[in-house]
Design a protein with these regions (language model features):
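Short, charged, surface-exposed secondary-structure boundary motifs
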Residues: 175-178, 189-196, 283-285
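Active-site periphery "cap/insert" segments of enzyme catalytic domains
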Residues: 2-6, 15-182, 230-239, 252-266, ...
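Acidic, metal/cofactor-coordinating or nucleic-acid-engaging core segments within structured domains
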Residues: 41-43, 191-238, 246, 288-297
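Histidine- and/or cysteine-centered catalytic micro-motif in compact active-site loops
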Residues: 183-188, 198, 248-249
């Protein structure tokens, strides 16, 4: 069987990394800027933080503040945001280490994700799985994150990775991770930050500018990067028996990929799993989770320009899992100390340094 995982920021959040855009904004706004365009943007951002939950989508709207005559100013702003975000994420990434015990759990979650389903869902998936089982399981992972946390956990080094055997009944099946791709690059290479298509660039002049398109439209940026990672990811989705979406908001700026996933489910017997975090569900009324699951199915198909029968087929073949502990591992600091403990223990040294600096001034 062929499995494809699409991994989003929820993966890093589950590791307790502060990788939400809001976390980054606090840092970004505090950084000094000499450039007037960047300073003005930070003022706008600071006054409208609640409206900037989706940085990429809002950048497409913010393009309205520019024209062809000052397109270079817009490019400078985009590059400044990208560079600052990369630096911030590198700091978060550097804090992360993982134990062997957590690695084992993460590998087990990858090859036995169905354990997080309800008993009824597990039974339904088991019926689907039996006729599709082969001598081994092939896992391909597409991450939308820029960080290196996934590589640290799984030890990925660019070659097929043996994840061990998976027992089903009296049989044992080998499991291999054959592909791992940063579809939007990393903080150090081909980092892609942008919108799904030209319709999300609200300024018509910039929308038609090849310079802006190459800097802001994800599909064009990937094509121009020339790595062919987008082709490899599309091929993986087109051949998948099972597709799992984990930790992704199902937002508009990744609509290109929702279309590829939806097409595979609509045109085949493949199954889609969406793992999502929602508000706390009262244990007394856990049966009401079905409403939330239906909402998530509807959200997914709302991005697809498909006919109604195709959308209904996709919803029937989609499992939704809420608030699972999948990929939940600990964030380990040196000697298991938290950042707050480290700062507290070094408070005296920091005070001494500040006094010395004061005398120098």
């Amino acid at each position: 069987m062929k499995f494809v995982f699409l991994i989003g920021n929820g993966f890093d959040l589950n590791l307790n990394l502060k990788t939400k855009y809001r976390n980054f904004y606090d840092r970004y706004i505090s950084l000094p800027s000499k450039n007037s365009t960047i300073k003005k943007f930070k003022e706008v951002l600071s006054d409208n933080l609640d409206n900037w939950a989706d940085l990429e989508l809002e950048l497409g709207k913010y393009a309205n503040n520019f024209g062809i005559e000052n397109e270079n100013d817009f490019m400078e702003l985009l590059y400044d945001i990208q560079d600052s975000l990369a630096d911030y994420l590198d700091e978060q990434d550097s804090n992360f280490t993982v134990t062997d015990e957590d690695k084992k759990k993460a590998i087990n979650d990858l090859i036995e994700f169905e354990k997080y389903l309800t008993a009824r869902e597990f039974s339904e998936y088991d019926v689907f799985k039996k006729p599709n089982q082969a001598t081994h399981f092939d896992v391909k992972v597409i991450t939308f994150n820029y960080t290196q946390t996934y590589e640290k956990i799984y030890g990925w080094n660019g070659r097929a990775l043996d994840l061990g055997n998976r027992r089903i009944g009296n049989s044992s099946y080998g499991t291999v991770m054959s592909l791992f791709e940063h579809i939007h690059g990393t903080t150090s290479s081909n980092m892609i930050l942008g919108v799904n298509d030209i319709s999300q660039i609200e300024n018509e002049d910039l929308r038609n500018s090849i310079v802006t398109r190459r800097a802001l439209i994800k599909t064009e940026m990937n094509a121009n990067a020339g790595t062919m990672r987008d082709d490899r990811c599309i091929k993986a989705i087109e051949e998948a028996d099972v597709i799992c979406i984990y930790g992704m908001s199902l937002g508009d700026t990744d609509r290109f990929w929702w279309d590829k996933v939806g097409l595979r489910i609509a045109k085949s017997n493949a199954r889609l799993f969406i793992f999502s975090k929602v508000g706390e569900l009262p244990r007394r009324r856990e049966y009401m989770a079905s409403n939330k699951k239906d909402e998530i199915r509807e959200l997914f198909v709302s991005h697809l320009d498909f006919d109604k029968p195709s959308k209904e087929k996709i919803k029937r073949q989609t499992f939704v899992c809420l608030n699972s502990n999948m990929f939940k591992v600990k964030l380990n600091y040196p000697e298991n100390k938290t950042p707050e403990q480290i700062v507290a223990e070094n408070a005296d040294a920091l005070t001494k340094v500040q006094k010395v600096l004061a005398t120098i001034k």
